[in-house]
From Swiss-Prot:
The lineage of its organism: Bacteria, Bacillati, Bacillota, Bacilli, Bacillales. One of its GO terms (biological process) is UMP salvage. It is found in: Cytoplasm. It catalyses: uridine + ATP = UMP + ADP + H(+); cytidine + ATP = CMP + ADP + H(+). Belongs to the uridine kinase family. This is Uridine kinase. Pathway: Pyrimidine metabolism; CTP biosynthesis via salvage pathway; CTP from cytidine: step 1/3; Pyrimidine metabolism; UMP biosynthesis via salvage pathway; UMP from uridine: step 1/1. The keyword Protein biosynthesis does not apply. The gene is udk. GO terms for cellular component: cytoplasm. The keyword Kinase applies. Keywords: ATP-binding, Cytoplasm, Kinase, Nucleotide-binding, Transferase. It comes from Anoxybacillus flavithermus (strain DSM 21510 / WK1). CDD domains: UMPK.
Length: 211
């Protein structure tokens, strides 16, 4: 009988290095059966709201995410069933009509700022990871990313950080660190921690007779 896939949850604040960590794990197991599932794709559909209301969306609050759909999709993947992953349109601030077909794999990496906040999600994880990076490093990374990649102004990024990102991080994201099995300081630059994670994943896969 085929064992269930391994689920790794990777959480941490915006700009902490979550994506760098998940990519490092993904690249290590490239050639094996592995997929990345980003929580950002699972923001709630807001097509029923006027555009002006959508502009007020707080993307750093737990209620912004459609965790019910995410959990449903993880259950399907655990049963080796394909899913149609939603696509979020940040220009319209709602879910796109497009979907991405995702085939089941033996390793599922679930990455997002609040993947450890929902107990139902945590209960599906074999390994829970929190990427812990100093606030000044996180804001610098966010500034560079949003200005360069998203065409934001310096003033708008700082205003959002002060009024939304920082308070939401302190209220909802940082407290989820206590649920982590592994805390990775310095994000993706902590090669020792990443190597330990890879070793743990390999052990679970071997126990599941997948490797």
């Amino acid at each position: 009988m085929r064992k269930k896939p391994v689920v790794i949850g990777v959480a941490g604040g915006s700009g902490s290095g979550k994506t760098t960590v998940t990519k490092a794990i993904y690249e290590h197991f490239q050639g094996h059966s592995i997929l990345m599932l980003e929580q950002d794709f699972y923001y709630k559909d807001q097509s029923h709201l006027p555009f002006e209301e959508r502009l007020k969306t707080n993307y750093d609050h737990p209620l912004a995410f459609d965790n019910d759909l995410l959990i449903e999709h993880i259950h399907k993947l655990l049963n080796y069933e394909p899913i149609d992953k939603p696509v979020y349109d940040y220009t319209l601030h709602t879910r796109s009509n497009e979907v991405i077909r995702v085939e089941p794999k033996d390793v599922i990496i679930l990455e997002g700022i609040l993947v450890l906040e929902d107990e139902r999600l945590r209960n599906l994880m074999d390994i829970k990871v929190y990427v812990d990076t100093d606030a000044d490093i996180r804001i610098i990374r966010r500034l560079l990313r949003d200005i360069k990649e998203r065409g934001r102004t310096l003033e708008s990024v700082i205003e959002q950080y002060v009024n939304v990102v920082r308070p939401m991080h302190n209220q909802f994201i940082e407290p989820t660190k206590r649920y982590a099995d592994i805390i990775i300081p310095e994000g993706g630059h902590n090669h020792v921690a990443i190597d330990l994670m890879v070793t743990k994943i390999q052990t679970i896969l071997e126990q599941n007779s997948i490797l």
